[in-house]
């Protein structure tokens, strides 16, 4: 409801003008707005340029993912997880398959655990590069988007090489991963866009295996991050737009259920990879970047520092995987499909494959909650089984939902232009918020 306050007495000669009432006005920010990051509709009550109240409206991307997952066998819903936070695909899969593994009582082989750890961090870098480019673009720094997508394209090639898809990989499976790392990387072919010395430079790191390619990437990525920081970190316009904007105190962040960078940017050292280690995070060395002021600038610095730490983890995983061959799927034929070679000359293997992917498998009755440290925060899957081949209940804990709930409390008192900066540092994706 519009608030009305009497205009202060003035010495204006126009009597009608002095009796005018000053009203707050309502502004619709999104859903068709380039800075809304999807389908966010934010109803802002404005007093001039100052935000008095913010009312986020969600649901425009609701697809009933939880109910869909409850209507299909356990192993047919992995693809739905990719489409929740569609910038952090494999991290979503990780939470879901871990929940299934807990109920069945199986554990992925060590090599598969290292592969999962490595791809979780590749996914984190993919997410943070997308965030960095889009947030900088929202605030007027277009060049950063072009720089960020240069490296992002290399990691998308890794996704495509391992799963056949650039985004929706469906690579993690209960009991391990879909397949081992390939021995070759796809190369660029000569075209109007790639030729001569540029083509040779692009293909130079693709001569060996995927691990060789990732090792080269991990060696060169810190210099690329330095380039991003050259463009932004000490840029006075960037600092004017982010320093002291969107300050979230530690107690406020915890009260709203914030996780991930939104919490660590306020100085709270909470990271599931350290506090509740899963996969092989207890076997790799990395640090947790923390903010001090809890503003947009601190959250920017935390994400940039996280990319450096993710790069460290990838490097350690690559070194381990190079010298430790082994299985990537548990030897439990309840969940593991037969090998492709055996299906070509063994009817039983063919039947096994057909039954596994058409009917799935029954999971022992019970309930569990499995969470991972996704790029945006704690992504969790609460799974209940009644002993059938379909989940009785699937509930997904999306970090963006809790973060968006705090929008009204955080943006009050700031200018309209600051709302764009704050929405950007929230790093919202409505696939997971609306589900």
From Swiss-Prot:
Gene3D superfamilies per UniProt: Cytochrome-c3 Hydrogenase, chain B
Keyword hit for NAD: yes
Entry keyword Protease: no
GO cellular component, one term: plasma membrane
Catalytic activity line of the entry: a quinone + NADH + 5 H(+)(in) = a quinol + NAD(+) + 4 H(+)(out)
Membrane topology: Peripheral membrane protein
InterPro entries the record matches: NADH_Q_OxRdtase_suD (IPR001135), NADH_UbQ_OxRdtase_49kDa_CS (IPR014029), NDH1_su_D/H (IPR022885), NiFe-Hase_large (IPR029014)
Compartment list: Cell inner membrane
Gene Ontology molecular function: NAD binding; NADH:ubiquinone reductase (non-electrogenic) activity; quinone binding
Purpose of the protein: NDH-1 shuttles electrons from NADH, via FMN and iron-sulfur (Fe-S) centers, to quinones in the respiratory chain. The immediate electron acceptor for the enzyme in this species is believed to be ubiquinone. Couples the redox reaction to proton translocation (for every two electrons transferred, four hydrogen ions are translocated across the cytoplasmic membrane), and thus conserves the redox energy in a proton gradient.
Subunit comment: NDH-1 is composed of 14 different subunits. Subunits NuoB, C, D, E, F, and G constitute the peripheral sector of the complex.
Family: Belongs to the complex I 49 kDa subunit family.
Protein name, entry field: NADH-quinone oxidoreductase subunit D
Species lineage: Bacteria, Pseudomonadati, Pseudomonadota, Gammaproteobacteria, Lysobacterales
